[in-house]
A protein has these predicted regions:
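Compositionally biased terminal segments of proteins
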Residues: 1-184
């Protein structure tokens, strides 16, 4: 796991030096808010807005090797840049632009995972929203772990409001109902 933290530290340092708005999301942040588990990569959201993605992707690809030959084209099409940190570990950088992502980055707080590894991370509520929205079996397990570990501390109204908006775009209203069951 230390190699993943080293990879995150390197990419976070690069982004912070440019004063970009970003935070860790995904499996590393599950350690803070949910049931800790193994993860093979570091995931971040980087606020790029719409139409400005290339201004962020190009400097990242000048510094870090893309995980695909068409890394820039893939990133611009799919809104996620797949790179390797210098230690060879995978880092996924999602390009943020939605109201939810802007809110998530404003709510992000610093967390010390271990000495020397302090990163901005999304809130428990925002991580729950992303996990429920993704909806894969492992994501639902993570959402359940967050709900259990943070029982009584989560802003359920915030979660359900943002999840409902995202699920409307994806046309998956049943996701909100599943999430509501975990939050009671």
């Amino acid at each position: 796991m230390n190699a993943i933290f080293e990879a995150a530290k390197e990419v976070v340092g690069f982004m912070a030096a440019r004063k970009w708005k970003f935070c860790l999301i995904g499996g590393l942040v599950v350690q803070r808010w949910g049931e800790p588990r193994f993860t093979k990569d570091a995931d971040l959201t980087l606020l790029t807005g719409l139409g400005e993605e290339e201004k962020f992707a190009e400097p990242l690809l000048e510094r870090f090797r893309g995980r695909r030959a068409d890394a820039l084209a893939f990133a611009l099409t799919n809104r996620v840049l797949l790179i390797y940190a210098s230690n060879g570990k995978d880092v996924d950088i999602s390009f943020g632009a939605l109201e939810f992502e802007v809110s998530m980055l404003k709510r992000a707080t610093l967390f010390e995972f271990a000495p020397g590894f302090v990163f901005p991370t999304c809130s428990a509520e925002d991580l729950f929203v992303m996990k429920a929205f993704a909806g894969r079996p492992l994501d639902w397990l993570d959402a359940k772990g967050i709900a259990e570990r943070q029982k009584g501390k989560l802003n359920t109204r915030y979660i359900l409001r943002h999840l409902a908006v995202l699920c409307e775009l994806k046309e998956t209203p049943e996701t909100v109902q599943e999430a509501r069951k975990l939050l009671v």
